[in-house]
Amino acid sequence: ASAHWADPYLDQLVDWGVMRADQTSNPDKPMTRAEFMAVINRAYGYTEMGEIPFTDVSFDDWFYDDVAIAYNAGYMAGTSETTASPNLGLTREQAVCILARNMMMKDTPGENLAFSDARKVSGWARGLVKTAVDSYIVSGYPDNTFGAHDSVSKGQVAALVVRCVGTPLNTPGEHVL
């Protein structure tokens, strides 16, 4: 099998303990909200759980802890006051905005996006998408589109997370930054 463009990012998440090696297959597969929360929680070291108001998440769901952690950390809200919709997919603009908010980024005024499909980016997302583009966290497709409403894939999330978290220093000694 030929290498996938996202393999280095997926490998990095495995090295960091964010994903298991068996979770890196099918990098083009759309990621669910629950899977996204699990990746973000592990990448950022979020562990503190809190109560959740969601009726569509039960204690025996594999993602219960991750939803409770994400909601408590404040980076993930429900799709309504009582639903988390953990099995729904996530769009590219949603994933970018969640990560940008998690990094305390602010909307970039002007909201001018250079993508040929920039008008398809939702109004609520434009400023944060612009900030993420300007910060080199996300780029569009080679055809100069962004695909705001496309499902975000496992490989795309891996690339976003690695760009947001950066490469940790894991060598002993003194480091000057």
Residues of each region from the PLM?
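PEST-like intrinsically disordered low-complexity regions enriched in serine, proline, threonine
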Residues: 12-13, 70, 132
